[in-house]
Amino acid sequence: MPKGYWVTFYRSVSNPAALTAYGKVAGPAIAAGGGRILARGAPARAYEAGLDQRCVVIEFDSLERAFAAYESPEYQAAKKLLEGSVERDVRMVEGI
């Protein structure tokens, strides 16, 4: 079964303290859902469109596990901590 990947790009962060608080709650919620953070932070180098956006890549044993972790009550509680503080794009993709 192919792995699932949760990829988030942060277009803007207006409240870094909210992002820190989110991380403290989201990390355990994601881990409880089977997620493993593979990469997190600003790009070392940006190509093509050249957007310098914070990025997070999380691996799951399957795409279904990624969906379930995102939709879990624990993660949804963490997500509320970001309201009004970030603009981001969250995508789920299946590995090959």
Residue ranges and their predicted role:
Residues 1-54, 61-71, 94-96:
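Short S/T/G/P-rich N-terminal loop/turn motif that feeds into the first structured element of a domain
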Residues 63-91:
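C-terminal structural segments of small proteins and small subunits
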